[in-house]
Amino acid sequence: MKQDSRFPNLFITDHPLIQHKLTHMRDKDTSTRTFRELLREITLLMGYEITRNLPITTKRVETPLVAVDAPVIAGKKLAIVPVLRAGIGMSDGLLDLVPSARVGHIGVYRADDHRPVEYLVRLPDLEDRIFILCDPMVATGYSAVHAVDVLKRRNVPAANIMFVALVAAPEGVQVFQDAHPDVKLFVASLDSHLNEHAYIVPGLGDAGDRLFGTKN
């Protein structure tokens, strides 16, 4: 992973496989089915990177040869929380990696002024649990900020929250960092800028529409 000196809490997963698959996702001619499969695959690969610092303890197990104290992840099961609707496509990849994880949902849509409007919150029990929030895009950053706000208002500590996205605009990352400098943001690409319609450039279009085969 690499970092950008402008954004201390931003981590960019620049693995060649991730970048290769992301290029195919950007292609406007990529089919809905392939887009969906690539999103799942990239998220799984990113999940490997973002979970590398999970707390570890040991468990006594019997191998065919000997008893040994072997490493296992400590604490409660992870919680994966997609930001609806496009985040659903990322939760599948994370569940492939951590099938025992709990799953919550935060439903947010963008109003005409690009501010988030919340319509759904369903979460597992919060105490002592690590949360991975996921949404393919961090454009204006407002939805990502709102999703973290939902957890913090329920007393989830910042150290137990991670946000993962495919692509982000610098404007959105700045908004996220200003609001939550204590929460790590993981992306596959920091793109150039937002256009006049608040779309990421070069981006990959509307992730939700491309994922579900709908039109905005």
Curated annotation (Swiss-Prot):
One GO BP: UMP salvage
Keywords noted in UniProt: Allosteric enzyme, Glycosyltransferase, GTP-binding, Magnesium, Nucleotide-binding, Transferase
MF annotations from Gene Ontology: GTP binding; magnesium ion binding; uracil phosphoribosyltransferase activity
Pathways involved: Pyrimidine metabolism; UMP biosynthesis via salvage pathway; UMP from uracil: step 1/1
InterPro entries, sorted: PRibTrfase_dom (IPR000836), PRTase-like (IPR029057), Upp_B (IPR034332), UPRTase/APRTase (IPR050054), Ura_phspho_trans (IPR005765)
EC code: 2.4.2.9
The record's free-text note on cofactor binding: Binds 1 Mg(2+) ion per subunit. The magnesium is bound as Mg-PRPP.
Activity modulation: Allosterically activated by GTP.
Binding site for 5-phospho-alpha-D-ribose 1-diphosphate: R85, R110, D135, P136, M137, V138, A139, T140, G141, Y142, S143, D206
One Pfam family from the record: UPRTase
Cofactor(s) needed for function: Mg(2+)
Binding site for uracil: I200, G205, D206, A207
Catalyses which reaction(s): UMP + diphosphate = 5-phospho-alpha-D-ribose 1-diphosphate + uracil
Described function: Catalyzes the conversion of uracil and 5-phospho-alpha-D-ribose 1-diphosphate (PRPP) to UMP and diphosphate.
Protein family membership: Belongs to the UPRTase family.
HAMAP family recorded: Upp_B
Protein name listed in UniProt: Uracil phosphoribosyltransferase
Source organism (scientific name): Burkholderia cenocepacia (strain ATCC BAA-245 / DSM 16553 / LMG 16656 / NCTC 13227 / J2315 / CF5610) (Burkholderia cepacia (strain J2315))
Gene from which the chain derives: upp
